[in-house]
C-alpha cells in the first residue's frame, strides 16, 4: 500500500495536538484526558506503513511482529517525539479510582498498573526504533519512580461506568485475560502485608523506610537504625539513667543490725559483719577478728593511750642525752635513744659520735609521689574551673592545656566528632555547614 497524503497525520511530529488528545472532538465521554475515540484508530495497513517509514519517508523492512501490530490497533499514539512510550497521565479529578481491582487489559500502559518486581524503565536509552507500548510483562512501571510504598494496588472503575466494548476485540480477549493474570500475579494481598506489620511494627516500618530510600535514591544508603530495647537484653531502667537491677552493684550498709543478735563478748548490736566463735555464738566483727588472730577473747577495757614520743617526760637519749626527738627508738640493750642515734646505730652498728650532735632537729621536705601530685593538680584545676568567667572555647582550651599531663585527650579541646555519611544521596539538600564539625567538651 502506498503512502497517501492524509497518512502523515499519524506521524507524531506533525500533529501533536491530535496525538496528545487535545482535540475537542477526540475525547471519549467516559474516560479522562489522552484517550481518543476508537473510530479514529488507524487501520492495520496504515500502522504497517507508519512503522515501516523512517525519518526521511523511506520504506524500510518491518521491524515488529504481528503481536505488536495487533497491540497497536488497540492503542492510539499519545505523545510526540521519541518518548512515545510514556503513559498518559490520568486526571486528578477522578474520585472513583481506588485500590480495589485492576482496570483491564486495555489499560495496560496506565501508570496505575504498577508492579514492584518490574525492572523495565519507561524511557528507552537506544536511539533505534521504539515501540509504542511494550509487552505485558514489561509494561508496568518501576515502583520506585511513582510511589515509595512497597505494595501498590490498581484502581477500580465505578460499577455504573462500563468499559467500551469497541476498545477490545473478540480476538484479543484471550490476550487481555493473560495480561490481567500477569498483573494480578505479582501483587501481594493486603492481609499478608498487614500481618507482617502487626507482628513487628518497628521492624516493618524500618524495612519500608529502607526500601523507600533505596527506591528513590539509586546511590547506596545506610539502613535506618532503630534500636530495639524491648528484647529484654537491657532493662527499661537503664534507659532512664537508673542503674539496672542485674548489672549494678548494691551499696551495702556499713552496719548490719538484726533483732535478737548481740555480741557475746562486748554486747554490740550492730556490726559490719557478724561472726561466730567456736561454740556458735555470735561475735561482732572486731571481737571475731581478735579471737581469730590471738586465740582469746578481745579485752573490753581499752588500754591507756601512750603519749607521743616528743612528750615523754623524763626520757632522754642514752647516747647523746637529748630530750627532744621526732621518734624514740631502743638500742640493743633496750635503752631509749633518739631517732638520730638509733638510725646511725642501725646503719653502721656503732654508736653515733657526740660530735655529730646538733641543737636543732634537721628535717627534710619529702617529695610528693607522682601519683599524689597528679591528684592534687587535678583537684586544684577542677576547683578553678567554675571560677572562670566565661565558658568559651578559648577558656576551655586553656583549662584543657593545664590538664595536658593527665588527660589523654589534652592535645585538642575537641573530643567528639559528628559522623558524616560516606555516600550522601544526590537529591538530598543539606543545611549550611558550620566552620567546625567537631563537638566541644562542653557538649
Curated annotation (Swiss-Prot):
A motif (YxKxHxxxRP) lies at residues 344-353. GO terms for cellular component: chromatin; nucleus. Interacts with the phosphorylated form of TBX21. This is Trans-acting T-cell-specific transcription factor GATA-3. PROSITE patterns: GATA_ZN_FINGER_1 (PS00344), GATA_ZN_FINGER_2 (PS50114). Keywords: Activator, DNA-binding, Immunity, Innate immunity, Metal-binding, Nucleus, Phosphoprotein, Repeat, Transcription, Transcription regulation, Zinc, Zinc-finger. Binds DNA via the 2 GATA-type zinc fingers. Each zinc finger may bind either adjacent sites in a palindromic motif, or a different DNA molecule allowing looping and long-range gene regulation. Its main location: nucleus. PANTHER family: TRANS-ACTING T-CELL-SPECIFIC TRANSCRIPTION FACTOR GATA-3, TRANSCRIPTION FACTOR GATA FAMILY MEMBER. The keyword Cell membrane does not apply. Residues 129-149, 414-429 have a biased composition (Low complexity). It holds the Pfam family GATA. SMART domains: ZnF_GATA. InterPro entries: TF_GATA-2/3, Transcription_factor_GATA, Znf_GATA, Znf_NHR/GATA.
